[in-house]
Every structure is written in structure tokens, then in C-alpha cells.
């Protein structure tokens, strides 16, 4: 039974509704000279990436899961002409660095597009060749090789990061890198204007105007009482504390503890969910480097102290022990990516072997290419549903990264 359009009180409850984004033309606007700035290491082949993503969506639908698409919800959210106009203004305001004062010309282009085509174009980016103009600004003479007025958003198929469902509410996130910062504008408009969400009084635990960075890949809902959040390159301690204070005080929240876990700052450890995901009541996939750090980790258990009327923070250095304590489980099993092998583990970690999507307790969706990790999961009693991902993985994200649960059954 659900009480609204958002209900996520665990990482493992039966998945009922999920938000995806099908890869689009934004991937074809990736070029080698600008890969770093757009946070990509390689260029996926769009046709095959779409086939792989369609297969992923079909697997979820075959499991009885309702699949919603970000791009479709966004288009349905701007049917009102005033909302559409404000949306365009907001997008252009956040793209001012690249549009070079050509708002009028870009708006003219947008005026010819249907709502769905407009959303697709904003996501894909606007090439300079699409708008024929004479140079009127010095920067255009000096920087005329840069090909975009509106940068593409190739990371959008990772719907986990711009937002996160927590309990009955969501965080609408301020992303760390400028290349991704506009992404959360879509969910912001969806929550405010889409018929499915707008009148549901969905709590925003963190909004996108928060001055501190937080990303959904670092946000794990361990239970109705406990959140785990990675302190990473992309999620700040300040954002975590702000979120903790908000959910501790709000009567619509059931959360009592926030476990903040410091992870290394590197692309291999991009978010907490690339190094640790919950897959059953007592099992987690884990990067072997985290296991080697046991006893030397920085873990902080944040709770609200009613007497002091403030938060209190307890330090721990053991991940396994901390998880057992906060989840009240006698024995937690941490399953290493690639069986902890120096070669297999590193290869499969690079290919998101620990970034699994749990669709119900003990059942996960993974990339088929991570065969060592998948076999190890099966040996631990986990049902593994494999999907192809040779092109999708080029964006450095797995099934959890590519999905945002909106409704899970309570455990």
C-alpha cells in the first residue's frame, strides 16, 4: 500500500515504480575535445546504447515494475504555456555562460518545437550551426571553435544522481560539476507541475537551490529508520548535515539515523553506490578496497539528541560493524567486486560491478560483463538478472545509476 507518488523506505523492497531516461541525441554531441568537461571517458554508440537501455527497461517491466521516463514526464509538465515559458527562461539563465547573449535567437528556435521536441532539444544541446548568426561579441571571435550554444547533457540517463527518493519525499540535488548542474531542473518542474505529483505535497528534503553539493548516487536508503550517505567528491558534509537536520525534524519523515561514510576522491569511487550497494536484508556488494580499509574508515553516525535539541555524532572505523549496528542485523555479509582479485576486481569495478539495482530482496539487475562478480553473488544466494551494457557502461554507471526508484513496497 502506498500513500503517494513517492515511497522509498529501503534499498531492497519490491520495486513498483522507477524513473528512467532513455539515451538520446545528447550522446551524439559528445566529441573527444570536450569529453572531460562533460564527464565522459568515451563516446557510446547511441543506437546500441538505446537497444541496451530498452532491454533494461523491458527486464524491469517483465518483473511487473512501472517504468516512467524523465523526458516524457518533463514534456507533460510544461503543457501550460506560462510554465513552458518560465521553464525556457530558467534553462537559458542556467546556460548563460555558453549562449553568449543569444537568448532571443534560441527562443525563436524553441518556439518552433513541440513540448516533447523542446525537452529533447534542451537535453541534447543546441549546436551553433543550428542558429545562423553573425558574431556580435568579442568572445565569439575568440572562442568560435566551441560548437555549442547549449551544452548537451549526456549524463542524464543516470537518473539516480540529480534527485533521490527518500521516504515520502525527495532531494532535488545541486550537482557538483557544472556539466550536470542543470539536470535537476527537470525533476523540479515535474514535481511542481506534473499532474501525477503537483498536488501531493511531496516533501523536498533538499532543494536544488541548496548551496551545498549532494548527488543521489551517494544517497542510500537502508531502512525506514536509516540513511547511508557518502561523503565524496560530489557530496559535501555540509549537505549531509543539512539533510539530516531536515529529516530528523519533519513529522513526515521516519528516519532516525544518517550514516555518513567517507569514500576516496577518485573516478573509481565516484559515489557511494559505485563501491557499496545493499542487495538483501544482510548482504551488500562492496569494492574490495573498502574491505581493505576496514578499521581505518571514517564513518559518522548522526542522530538527533532530544535532550540537547541538536544532532549528535558518533565516529566509527568499521563498515561491517556499523551496518550490523544500525540495521540491527547479527551478521552482515560484504561481497567483494570481482571476488577481491587484484585484476578481476579492478576490471569489474571499473565496469560498475558493485553498482547493482535490487528489485526485491535477494534479486538484482547487473551488467552481464561482470561475470566474476555475478557468479559470486549467485554463490551467496542472490538471483542475478543480467543485462548487456557494453555501450551504457562507457558513461561509468551501472543499473543502480540508471534508475531512480519512486515507489518500493515496505519491508
Swiss-Prot record:
Catalytic site positions: 401 (amidino-cysteine intermediate)
Pathway: Amino-acid degradation; L-arginine degradation via ADI pathway; carbamoyl phosphate from L-arginine: step 1/2
NCBIfam families on file: arcA, PRK01388.1
Protein name per the record: Arginine deiminase
Catalytic activity field: L-arginine + H2O = L-citrulline + NH4(+)
Organism superkingdom: Bacteria
SUPFAM superfamilies: Pentein
PANTHER family attached to this UniProt entry: ARGININE DEIMINASE
Alphabetized GO MF terms: arginine deiminase activity
GO cellular component, one term: cytoplasm
Pfam families xrefs: ADI
Record-annotated disulphide pairs: none
GO biological process: arginine catabolic process to ornithine; arginine deiminase pathway
Main location: cytoplasm
EC number: 3.5.3.6
Annotated localization: Cytoplasm
Keywords: Arginine metabolism, Cytoplasm, Hydrolase
Family to which this protein belongs: Belongs to the arginine deiminase family.
Amino acid at each position: 500500500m502506498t500513500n503517494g507518488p513517492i515511497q522509498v523506505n529501503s534499498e531492497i523492497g519490491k520495486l513498483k515504480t522507477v524513473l528512467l531516461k532513455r539515451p538520446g541525441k545528447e550522446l551524439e554531441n559528445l566529441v573527444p575535445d570536450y569529453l572531460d568537461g562533460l564527464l565522459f571517458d568515451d563516446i557510446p554508440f547511441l543506437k546500441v546504447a538505446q537497444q541496451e537501455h530498452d532491454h533494461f527497461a523491458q527486464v524491469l517491466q517483465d518483473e511487473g515494475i512501472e517504468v516512467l521516463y524523465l523526458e516524457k514526464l518533463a514534456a507533460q509538465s510544461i503543457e501550460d504555456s506560462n510554465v513552458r515559458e518560465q521553464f525556457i527562461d530558467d534553462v537559458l539563465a542556467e546556460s548563460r555562460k555558453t549562449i553568449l547573449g543569444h537568448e532571443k535567437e534560441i527562443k525563436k528556435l524553441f518556439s518552433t518545437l513541440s513540448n516533447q521536441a523542446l525537452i529533447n532539444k534542451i537535453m541534447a544541446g543546441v549546436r551553433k550551426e543550428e542558429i545562423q548568426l553573425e558574431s556580435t561579441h568579442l568572445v565569439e571571435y575568440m572562442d568560435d571553435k566551441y560548437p555549442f550554444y547549449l551544452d548537451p547533457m549526456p549524463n542524464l540517463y543516470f537518473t539516480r544522481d540529480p534527485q533521490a527518493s527518500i521516504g515520502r519525499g525527495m532531494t532535488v540535488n545541486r550537482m557538483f560539476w557544472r556539466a550536470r548542474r542543470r539536470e535537476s531542473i527537470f525533476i523540479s518542474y515535474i514535481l511542481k507541475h506534473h499532474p501525477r505529483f503537483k498536488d501531493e505535497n511531496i516533501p523536498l528534503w533538499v532543494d536544488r537551490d541548496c548551496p551545498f553539493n549532494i548527488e543521489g548516487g551517494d544517497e542510500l536508503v537502508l531502512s525506514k529508520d536509516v540513511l547511508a550517505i557518502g561523503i565524496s567528491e560530489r557530496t559535501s558534509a555540509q549537505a549531509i548535515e543539512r539533510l539530516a537536520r531536515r529529516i530528523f525534524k519533519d513529522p513526515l519523515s521516519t528516519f532516525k539515523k544518517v550514516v555518513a561514510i567517507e569514500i576516496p576522491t577518485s573516478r573509481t569511487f565516484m559515489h557511494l553506490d559505485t563501491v557499496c550497494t545493499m542487495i538483501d536484508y544482510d548482504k551488500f556488494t562492496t569494492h574490495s578496497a573498502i574491505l581493505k580499509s576496514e578499521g581505518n574508515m571514517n564513518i559518522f553516525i548522526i542522530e538527533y539528541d532530544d535532550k540537547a535539541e541538536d544532532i549528535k555524532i558518533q565516529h566509527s572505523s568499521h563498515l561491517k560493524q556499523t551496518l550490523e549496528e544500525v540495521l540491527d542485523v547479527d551478521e552482515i555479509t560484504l561481497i567483494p567486486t570481482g571476488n577481491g582479485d587484484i585484476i578481476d576486481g579492478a576490471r569489474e569495478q571499473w565496469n560498475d560491478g558493485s553498482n547493482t539495482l535490487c528489485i526485491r530482496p535477494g534479486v538484482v539487475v547487473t551488467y552481464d560483463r561482470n561475470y566474476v562478480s555475478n557468479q559470486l553473488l549467485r554463490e551467496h544466494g542472490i538471483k542475478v538478472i543480467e543485462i548487456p551494457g557494453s555501450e551504457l557502461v562507457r558513461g561509468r554507471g551501472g543499473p543502480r545509476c540508471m534508475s531512480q526508484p519512486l515507489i518500493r513496497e515496505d519491508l
